[in-house]
Structures are given as structure tokens and as C-alpha cells.
Design a protein with these regions (language model features):
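Auxiliary Fe-S-binding modules of radical SAM enzymes
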Residues: 1-53, 250-376
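Conserved, mostly hydrophobic/aromatic
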Residues: 64, 92, 130, 183, ...
Length: 376
């Protein structure tokens, strides 16, 4: 596949702001000023991500909760991922699917995919995220497209988290029923990125960076962003993720924007990398800052986090939660019978019904679907 270039200045703007971001320069006055505003500037967002803002977590949480209730009410959206292949052509040193890792590989055929979809649909879920390893050879666009057509038979909302593709490919996938695209930049530090991604198309930083914009050019309704917090300086990566989403929202105001906040987790046969530890308090700070800077964006909290943390954060800032998650291949139905190994370890293994009931006990409203398709 020839990697498409698009005419966009967003990457240069994000990298420039990230390089100039000195999070140790902010004062108590900067934090208080940001918290007194209804709408944050970029500098306000930077202030709330600073170490100094850790002293204001209670105030940030209160403000974030007010913002969440203003724009989302008490709704919490529920979805689940479905991994259909774990073959990968990339060598990302931190990932369980990387091409050098000796794991059990598998790719579901269409009969197995449909069996998985049927089983998941019995839970009442109406949104699903289709995931593959990043291998065009084993997971072609046509294969993914057919899988998404099957998914639309059972689910109202279908998202994908696959390798980045060109605009025409996104248009094709949209015609197969795909609504939104999730791409994690992993880290926005290009030099660190080179050290972590050693083989495959993922080595090309700029192509991955522009994926969300190509997806919107390819008629997708929404896009999701995320850095894998802990790979590098997490404050700069958190800022860059939010600023990237902010600039794309300004350029494409019709787009639905989502932010994910994953932290680095153990994987099978993982080699030692220079991990930047991110505490739960620091992750909570980041999520609150995202909510205040991007009030209309969905914020997804991953099963990489434990159940107690997830339950707390959906009451304050996050709006979307995964349930019934297994990152292995063929993990949901007896027909598929767990054919391939997991991408990473998860911390919250609750079922859909368990999370559904927990949300209700917190006086929140679990939502399976909020989008209606109108046929011509």
C-alpha cells in the first residue's frame, strides 16, 4: 500500500506546541485562573496538566463533574471490542501483538466472526469496536470490510481500530457500515517513537498522525485519539493528544471526537522499556483536564484500569466505558474457542450486565446507543 500524504498543518502545530510546553512554569495563579473559566484556552489546558495542578485535584474534579453533567447529563455509553486477528507486521517493542513476539496467532474466518458477534449481541450491547493486528497481508481492507458488514447486522454502531489507511480505503470501510475510527499515536515524541517502532508501516510517524483527518475525509462520523501513557513524558503526550483533537475539531466541526486514556500494561513476553510511571492520581488529573478543555468530547476509560477507578471516573469526567472485554482472538463464543493470545493484560473483567447494574447503582444512565440511521 502506498502511504498517502494529505495537505494539513496540524501535525506541525501540535509538535511545535508540545516542544514549547514547559509544564513546570505554571503557577498557582495560572491554575486558579483556568478553573474560573467556562471555556479553556490552550494555555489553560497546559496549566491544568502541570504538576502544580495536582494540588487542585478536588477543584478540578468538581468543575469536571459540572461540565460532564451539563453536556452529557447522567449518561454513560457502553461498548465492547472484538479482536478478529492478532497477526501484525510491526515491531513495537511494548506491544503483545508485535511481529517478533512468540505468541499464538490467529485470524477468525467469517463464520467465526459472526458467531462472536451473535454471542456479544445477546448482552444487549449495540456498539462494537472491531480490532485487528496491523497486518495488511492477514487483515486486508476487504477482510475488515466484510467483518464490518457482518457487525452491522447485529450492532447499530460499528467502530474500527486497525492499521491506518488512505482516504479511499476509509470511504470503502464507511460504505461497509463503519461509523468511527480509533487510532492511538502512542507517543507524540518523534524521537522516542522511532526507538519504539522498529519495523512496519507504523514506523512512519506522520502517516499515523494524520489518520484521523484522513478518516474524516473518508466520510467517517467520528474519530478517537489516544497516547499510551507511560511510553514517554506523559504530560507532554497528554497535552499533544488533547491539542491534536482540539485542532481537528476546529477544522471539522461536524466530527464526533473521543479521547482514550490508556496506561501502559504488561504484555506476553514484553521486553524491558524505559517506562514513565503514571499514577492513578496523575491519570485522574489528565482525564479531568481533558473534560474541561474538550467539553463535548467523549472520554473512554479502558479496562486497563481497575474497576474501582473506572467506577469513580465515570461519575466525574469519563462518559464511555468498555464491558465484557477480552483482548484475545475468538474469546466470546464456543465456536471460536479462544484461538489467539491477548494483546495486553486487562484489570477489569466484569461482564456487560455487571457494569450495566453498577452504573445504575451510581444514579447514572447506561446507554447502549444514541444514534439513529435514517434511510433514504
Amino acid at each position: 500500500m502506498e502511504l498517502e500524504n494529505i495537505n494539513s498543518d496540524i501535525m506541525d502545530r501540535v509538535i511545535s506546541e508540545m516542544n514549547n510546553y514547559d509544564y513546570n512554569s505554571f503557577t498557582d495563579e495560572d491554575i486558579r485562573e483556568a478553573l474560573n473559566k467556562d471555556y479553556l484556552s490552550v494555555r489553560d489546558f497546559q496549566a491544568l496538566l502541570s504538576p502544580k495542578a495536582m494540588n487542585y485535584l478536588e477543584e478540578m474534579a468538581k468543575k469536571a463533574k459540572e461540565c460532564r453533567e451539563r453536556y452529557f447529563g447522567n449518561s454513560v455509553y457502553i461498548f465492547t471490542p472484538l479482536y478478529i486477528s492478532n497477526y501484525c507486521d510491526n515491531y513495537c517493542v511494548y506491544c503483545g501483538f508485535n511481529s517478533h513476539n512468540k505468541i499464538k496467532r490467529a485470524r477468525l474466518d467469517f463464520e467465526q466472526i459472526e458467531a462472536e458477534l451473535k454471542e456479544i449481541s445477546k448482552t444487549g450491547l449495540e456498539e462494537i469496536l472491531i480490532l485487528t493486528g496491523e497486518s495488511e497481508r492477514y487483515s486486508s481492507i476487504e477482510y475488515i470490510g466484510e467483518a464490518c458488514k457482518l457487525a452491522r447486522k447485529y450492532f447499530n454502531n460499528v467502530g474500527i481500530e486497525i492499521y491506518p489507511v488512505n482516504v479511499e480505503d476509509y470511504k470503502y470501510l464507511n460504505s461497509c457500515g463503519v461509523d468511527y475510527v480509533t487510532i492511538f499515536q502512542e507517543t507524540y515524541n518523534n524521537e522516542k517513537y522511532k526507538k519504539l517502532h522498529l519495523e512496519g508501516h507504523k514506523k512512519v510517524f506522520s502517516y499515523r498522525f494524520n489518520s484521523q483527518e484522513r478518516a474524516l475525509m473518508g466520510n467517517m462520523r467520528g474519530v478517537a485519539f489516544g497516547a499510551l501513557l507511560g511510553l514517554d513524558d506523559f504530560r507532554k503526550d497528554a497535552f499533544s493528544t488533547g491539542y491534536h483533537a482540539y485542532l481537528l475539531q476546529k477544522k471539522y466541526p461536524h466530527a464526533e471526537i473521543s479521547i482514550s486514556c490508556p496506561r501502559l500494561r504488561p504484555v506476553i513476553n514484553n521486553i524491558k522499556i524505559e517506562e514513565e510511571f503514571v499514577s492513578e492520581k496523575e491519570l485522574f488529573q489528565i482525564i479531568c483536564a481533558y473534560r474541561l478543555f474538550l467539553p463535548f468530547a467523549n472520554i473512554t476509560i479502558s479496562t486497563r484500569e481497575n474497576s474501582k477507578f473506572r467506577d469513580n471516573v465515570i461519575k466525574i469526567a469519563a462518559t464511555k466505558i468498555s464491558a465484557g472485554v477480552d483482548t484475545g482472538i475468538g474469546a466470546h463464543s464456543e465456536h471460536s474457542n479462544k484461538k489467539g493470545d491477548e494483546q495486553f493484560e486487562i484489570a477489569d473483567r466484569r461482564t456487560v450486565s455487571e457494569i450495566f447494574e453498577k452504573i445504575k447503582t451510581e444514579d447514572l444512565q447506561p446507554v447502549m446507543n444514541d444514534y439513529i440511521y435514517l434511510k433514504d
